[in-house]
């Protein structure tokens, strides 16, 4: 298992490259109760030249670590109804991820009500206090959320949840305006969410982002096939 990179070292590694999100949830075609599928996705991504992997769950992350030394952005998706945040939504999930020695832990940092009752700045501060050497990424949906997370000391701001909160911009593709605004504010941005084509990724890279995550367009065959099928209907 490689040593955890510093922020500067990781930014060097991610610059100008693609982080591939390798995830499948229960009910999706590539989900398996016994595992074994996401590490194959990660292996394919590495062979293509990916600079990092984003993965969900302790099991998948451990399996991916066994086959690649690429830096991992780790999350744990767990619902806490009636609250909406479900991406590494409490300290319990942070603890589980911190034990894996991964490069980055990503967390929901939207302004929505949380299961733990904390505001996002307080949550970030608690995590940083408990794990001072752990790099952290805020999954946000608006500029203001990104700014709050940045000011609270987060290392990276990801545009992951733009379009997935009712109050954020609803776009069919990536929220380029949000990515650009965060970059102009001097924030280390990891662009993520609805990046469907190499052309979109190139355009986003030219904005000066710290990294780019592509998921569905690479690792969700049902979604990819659906796009081709819908195009023929129009």
Curated annotation (Swiss-Prot):
Under CDD domains, the record lists: NanE
Q: Does Isomerase count among this protein's keywords?
A: yes
Catalytic reaction list: an N-acyl-D-glucosamine 6-phosphate = an N-acyl-D-mannosamine 6-phosphate
Q: GO biological process: what's one of them?
A: N-acetylneuraminate catabolic process
**Entry annotated with the keyword Isomerase:** yes
**Pathway(s):** Amino-sugar metabolism; N-acetylneuraminate degradation; D-fructose 6-phosphate from N-acetylneuraminate: step 3/5
Query: What keywords sit in the KW lines?
Result: Carbohydrate metabolism, Isomerase
Which enzyme class? isomerase
EC numbers listed for it are: 5.1.3.9
- Taxonomy, superkingdom: Bacteria
Which molecular-function annotations from GO does this UniProt entry contain? N-acylglucosamine-6-phosphate 2-epimerase activity
Q: Which GO terms describe its cellular component?
A: cytosol
Similarity field: Belongs to the NanE family.
The UniProt function text for this chain reads: Converts N-acetylmannosamine-6-phosphate (ManNAc-6-P) to N-acetylglucosamine-6-phosphate (GlcNAc-6-P).
Please report the name of this protein according to its UniProt entry.
Putative N-acetylmannosamine-6-phosphate 2-epimerase
What is the protein's species of origin?
Streptococcus pyogenes serotype M6 (strain ATCC BAA-946 / MGAS10394)
Organism lineage reads as:
Bacteria, Bacillati, Bacillota, Bacilli, Lactobacillales
